[in-house]
Amino acid sequence: MSIETLVEEIGKLTLTEASELVKALEEKFGVSAAPAIVAGIASAAPAGDAPAQEEKTEFDVVLTSAGESKINVIKVVRALTGLGLKEAKDLVDGAPKTVKEAVSKDEAEKIAKELKDVGAGVELK
């Protein structure tokens, strides 16, 4: 099983299952979750230098253009973000703008698909 597959499977866990996984790993390897987080942050910085997009876990969904159907794009942006009509319109009119920040790959792809389905230009960063 590759690391990427393992990460995807872990991402599918519920919060309760993830908590149980952390406890099981702590017991199995005799470690604490707090130092593991610090180590994860420290090791994430050098990985940024290497061109390895497969390891990226958080994405920003950027609206690059409204396309032909601006009204439908505004409706989708409102549904995705919870913004009011004016705020959603300003976001769409000001493209390129970030619609959602730091979302999982699956969620980012879902959001991008919804926006593309109504004719918007979308980019994942």
Swiss-Prot record:
Cross-referenced InterPro entries, in alphabetical order? Ribosomal_bL12, Ribosomal_bL12_C, Ribosomal_bL12_C/ClpS-like, Ribosomal_bL12_oligo, Ribosomal_bL12_oligo_N_sf
Q: What family is this? A: Belongs to the bacterial ribosomal protein bL12 family.
- Which Gene Ontology CC terms are recorded? cytosolic large ribosomal subunit
* GO BP annotation list: translation
Q: What is this protein called?
A: Large ribosomal subunit protein bL12
- Assembly information from the UniProt record: Homodimer. Part of the ribosomal stalk of the 50S ribosomal subunit. Forms a multimeric L10(L12)X complex, where L10 forms an elongated spine to which 2 to 4 L12 dimers bind in a sequential fashion. Binds GTP-bound translation factors.
| Assigned keywords, A-Z | Ribonucleoprotein, Ribosomal protein
Q: Which domain of life is it from?
A: Bacteria
What is the protein's known function?
Forms part of the ribosomal stalk which helps the ribosome interact with GTP-bound translation factors. Is thus essential for accurate translation.
